[in-house]
Structure formats: structure tokens, C-alpha cells
């Protein structure tokens, strides 16, 4: 499947559905309240994330694809906070704001990685007139390659049949993540993406693969779908279409930490790929890979183009390969939660030689994960002179990504990685050569966090300068 790509240059996706804001309060619980037999949580930090249809839009934006989001919110602080959060990710928000309803908000209180309580602030929109929302859809849909209707049963999709007909009239495929057991209301959609529980609640118990295929094809015929994608957790996913063989994909998940939002990821990647002109098979393959990535993260999460590209090309077995700083921080947080020891080193790695390979292998043996921070081309030029680097950053990163000792690669543009090391805070900082530990960039930050710093020896006679000199001598 290496010919598949996570670059969606032609895609534009429109999302309409139940938007909500997920709020998280994290704190310590060290005592019971004297007022009632409940724990007292001393809140230490909080976080806000887009939920529902807004998380679908976030998933699409993380793939560097233009996305517009339509939905209903209140005229309140929460609605403004949600809009601001989405706009920072370059999502075009066009909401109908209602003075009669609050923005749907879910507040979760957590301590020691356990959810203690969830507070829901909502009043469903089932009695709200959809005229303004339908007008917005009619004006916008013709400019997009796919429409996602994200149904969380909150009432935004009251007039879902009219929405489907508007999209069909514009010849835009409609993908729906369904809710409830009344699938008749989705008649005429291009594709539904129920999970196995939702599917069986509608068609009945499926004991065999044949049952899934037979009942799925009957459902397609009954409600006039073009296709049906049943997501089956650890059993992968199955695509069904009239007159064609079932297309089954085994799960891509290596480790499962949280399935929150996995369905949003599936439909987001699926719609993006179809909007980019990909086949159903390729779109399903890509969404399956993306789901395998996102369930390895905590909470409602998204998948980036880099993560998806790495996984497609088989680089996920050594971590997530090449990452940006934000992705690296998430990966490190998850690894530390699993009790893994993080080792970090850095360098230019202009011309990779046996000394580099041996050094990185030795560094990797000191922990469970190895991060390699690599100087950008401008950074190398400032340090080594105008004739360097010999190999540009993408080339250097690609070669390093091929080493089994390297888990994660990240670029930095400063002269030293001190800032980056101070933000990542590895358990062990490693540097090769004749440095004193206290002179290594980032050592003070690592020590202050309780980590350690170690100097490793390079192999004698192995250096990039020596390699360059030999090449020059041969040229002369």
C-alpha cells in the first residue's frame, strides 16, 4: 500500500452537525470533603478541546485540508471559546447562534488519570427551526468535494433529509456518522459509518462475516445508500457496496489507550480522501490507518499528515518517525504514562557514517525511546559555514528515520536545542564527544527535572569532516 499518500492537495470538506466544547479540569485529590462523603479536587490545570462535529473539523484541519463547519451554538462565552479554538486551527466557522440555547459543553473532572465526574451543559436543539442552517448549507455545499453530517443526537440534524437532498442536488457525496436506530432518516446518503454495536442495533445480531455482508447489503438497498462502512473495533472495518465484493481491513492499532473520537477520525479521513478524488478502497485504507494511530492517544485527538504518512510507509513500528514539536510532546507524554524511559540526543548528522550509527545504537540502549533532534539547514549553516550542510534537512531526516535505533525525529532552528530539550524534558540527555556534562545544551533543564545527562564516545576516525575531506581528496 506504499503507493497511497497522505497529501490531500485537491480536497475541501464541509462539516455540519452537533458542535460542542469539551472541558477538562485536572487536579489532586488528597482528602474527603467535611460537607459530604465526596473527594475534594484541588484544580491545578484545565484544558479545552473541540467535541462532536467540531472535533471532526479539527481532524480534517490537522490534515492541512480546507474545512468549513456549520452548526448551532448559544450566544454565550462557551460559544465564543469554541469558535476561537477552531479558528486557531484555520477552520472556517459559520454558526447559527441562538439566544435561547447554551452551547453544548461537557466538563470532565479528573484526578490521577481517572474521571471523577462529568457535567453536561446542554438543551437539545430538536425544536429549533433549521431554515437559516439549511440556507447556509445550500450556499456553501457546491464549493466542497464532500459533506460530513455529524450526528450526536442533539437536534442539529433535525432536517437531515433536506440536508441530504441539498448535497445530492449539488452532486456532493454525503457521509454520515449515524446516531440511534432510525437509519431510515439517512435515506439517500452516499455512505454511513456505524460501529458494530450501532449496526447490530438496526439489522440484528450478526454471528458470522456472512451475516454482516448479507444484512449490510440489505440495509444499503432498503435506504438507498451507495456504500456502508462498518467499523468493528479490534476486528478492523468492512466496506460494503451493491454488486461488489466486501472489502475488509484488519485493525491497524498496535496499542489502544482511548477510543474517544476514533469514529470522528475515520469519517474525517474518509471524506477527505473521497474529496481528493481517491477510490473507496483507498479512502477506507487511509481511515483505517488513521484510526489505528488515534486510539493510541489519550482523549479526543487528531491525526496529522506526518503521522499518517509515517504509518502508511511502515515507519510506525519505530514510533511515529518524523514529527513536529507538538506531536513529539504528545508522544513523549504517552510514553512516560506507560513508564517508558525517554533518551534524547541532537546533532547535524550531515553525512551519516558508522560512528553515527554506533552512537545512536548505544544511546537507544540506555532507555526505551530515543529522540533525535536535528539542526535545520539554516542552523547548520550558522554553525558549520556556508558550504554546509551537504545534505538538506529532508534528506538527513529520511536517512535517520531508516535506523531501527531511532524512535522520533524532530527539527530545531536555533543554534542549540536548549529550548526544545527544556520543553520535552527527557529522562536522559545524551551527547557524543568530549563534552563536560554541564556544558551540554539543555543539561540544566534536564537535571532540574530530575533527569540525567551522559556523554558517549564516538568511534575513532569517524567524523563528517573526515568524510568530506576524503571526498575532496578524491576529487583533486
From Swiss-Prot:
Keyword Zinc part of the UniProt annotation: no
UniProt keyword terms in alphabetical order: ATP-binding, Carbohydrate metabolism, Kinase, Multifunctional enzyme, Nucleotide-binding, Nucleotidyltransferase, Transferase
Catalysed conversion reaction: D-glycero-beta-D-manno-heptose 7-phosphate + ATP = D-glycero-beta-D-manno-heptose 1,7-bisphosphate + ADP + H(+); D-glycero-beta-D-manno-heptose 1-phosphate + ATP + H(+) = ADP-D-glycero-beta-D-manno-heptose + diphosphate
Domain of life: Bacteria
Entry's Gene Ontology BP terms: ADP-L-glycero-beta-D-manno-heptose biosynthetic process
Segments of this protein annotated with the region Cytidylyltransferase: 344-476
One GO MF term attached to the UniProt entry: ATP binding
Binding site for ATP: 195-198
Enzyme class: transferase
GO cellular component: cytosol
Entry EC no(s): 2.7.1.167, 2.7.7.70
Annotated spans, Ribokinase: 1-318
CDD domains: RfaE_like
Location of the active site: 264
Record carries keyword Kinase: yes
Pathway the protein takes part in: Nucleotide-sugar biosynthesis; ADP-L-glycero-beta-D-manno-heptose biosynthesis; ADP-L-glycero-beta-D-manno-heptose from D-glycero-beta-D-manno-heptose 7-phosphate: step 1/4; Nucleotide-sugar biosynthesis; ADP-L-glycero-beta-D-manno-heptose biosynthesis; ADP-L-glycero-beta-D-manno-heptose from D-glycero-beta-D-manno-heptose 7-phosphate: step 3/4
InterPro entries per the UniProt record, alphabetical: Bifunc_HldE, Cyt_trans-like, PfkB_dom, RfaE_dom_I, RfaE_dom_II, Ribokinase-like, Rossmann-like_a/b/a_fold
Function: Catalyzes the ADP transfer from ATP to D-glycero-beta-D-manno-heptose 1-phosphate, yielding ADP-D-glycero-beta-D-manno-heptose.
Assembly with partners or alone: Homodimer.
NCBIfam families: cyt_tran_rel (TIGR00125), PRK11316.1 (NF008454), rfaE_dom_I (TIGR02198), rfaE_dom_II (TIGR02199)
Family stated for the protein in its record: In the N-terminal section; belongs to the carbohydrate kinase PfkB family.
Protein name: Bifunctional protein HldE
Gene: hldE
Amino acid at each position: 500500500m506504499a503507493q497511497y499518500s497522505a497529501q490531500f492537495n485537491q480536497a475541501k470538506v464541509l462539516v455540519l452537525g452537533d458542535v460542542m466544547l469539551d472541558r477538562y479540569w485536572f487536579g489532586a485529590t488528597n482528602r474527603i470533603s467535611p460537607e459530604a462523603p465526596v473527594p475534594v479536587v484541588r484544580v491545578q490545570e484545565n484544558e479545552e478541546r473541540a467535541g462532536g462535529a467540531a472535533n471532526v473539523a479539527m481532524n480534517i484541519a490537522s490534515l492541512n485540508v480546507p474545512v468549513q463547519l456549520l452548526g448551532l451554538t448559544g450566544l454565550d462565552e462557551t460559544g465564543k471559546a469554541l469558535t476561537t479554538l477552531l479558528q486557531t486551527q484555520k477552520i472556517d466557522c459559520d454558526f447559527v447562534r441562538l439566544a435561547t440555547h447554551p452551547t453544548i459543553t461537557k466538563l470532565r473532572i479528573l484526578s490521577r488519570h481517572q474521571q471523577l465526574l462529568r457535567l453536561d451543559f446542554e438543551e437539545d436543539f430538536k425544536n429549533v427551526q433549521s431554515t437559516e442552517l439549511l440556507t447556509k448549507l445550500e450556499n456553501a455545499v457546491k464549493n466542497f468535494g464532500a459533506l460530513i453530517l455529524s450526528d450526536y443526537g442533539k437536534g442539529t440534524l433535525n432536517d437531515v433529509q433536506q440536508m441530504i437532498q441539498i448535497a445530492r442536488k449539488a452532486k456532493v457525496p454525503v457521509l454520515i456518522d449515524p446516531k440511534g436506530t432510525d437509519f431510515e432518516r439517512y435515506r439517500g446518503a452516499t455512505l454511513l459509518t456505524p460501529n458494530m454495536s450501532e449496526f447490530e442495533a438496526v439489522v440484528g445480531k450478526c454471528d458470522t462475516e456472512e451475516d454482516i455482508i448479507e444484512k449490510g447489503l440489505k440495509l444499503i438497498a432498503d435506504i438507498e445508500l451507495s456504500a456502508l462502512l462498518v467499523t468493528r473495533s479490534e476486528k478492523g472495518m468492512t466496506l460494503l457496496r451493491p454488486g461488489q465484493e466486501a472489502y475488509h481491513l484488519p485493525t491497524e492499532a498496535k496499542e489502544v489507550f482511548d477510543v474517544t473520537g476514533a469514529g470522528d477520525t475515520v469519517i474525517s479521513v474518509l471524506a477527505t480522501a473521497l474529496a481528493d478524488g481517491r477510490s473507496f478502497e483507498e479512502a477506507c485504507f487511509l481511515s483505517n490507518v488513521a484510526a489505528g494511530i488515534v486510539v493510541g492517544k489519550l482523549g479526543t485527538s487528531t491525526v496529522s499528515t506526518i503521522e499518517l504518512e509515517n504509518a502508511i510507509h511502515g515507519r510506525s513500528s519505530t514510533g511515529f518517525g518524523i514529527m513536529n514539536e507538538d506531536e513529539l510532546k504528545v508522544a513523549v507524554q504517552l510514553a512516560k504514562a506507560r513508564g517508558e524511559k525517554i533518551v534524547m540526543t541532537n546533532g547535524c548528522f550531515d553525512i551519516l557514517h558508522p560512528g553515527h550509527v554506533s552512537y545512536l545504537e548505544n544511546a537507544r540502549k540506555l532507555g526505551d525511546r530515543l529522540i533525535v533532534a536535528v539542526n535545520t539547514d539554516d542552523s547548520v549553516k550558522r554553525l558549520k559555514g556556508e558550504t554546509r550542510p551537504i545534505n538538506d534537512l529532508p534528506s538527513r531526516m529520511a536517512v535517520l528515520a531508516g535506523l531501527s535505533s531511532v524512535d522520533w525525529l524532530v527539527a530545531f532552528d536555533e543554534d542549540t536545542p536548549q529550548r526544545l530539550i527544556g520543553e520535552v524534558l527527557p529522562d536522559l540527555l545524551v551527547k557524543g564527544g568530549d563534552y563536560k556534562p554541564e556544558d551540554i545544551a539543555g543539561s540544566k533543564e534536564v537535571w532540574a527535572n530530575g533527569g540525567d545527562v551522559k556523554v558517549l564516545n564516538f568511534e575513532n576516525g569517524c567524523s563528517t569532516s573526515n568524510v568530506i575531506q576524503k571526498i575532496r581528496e578524491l576529487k583533486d
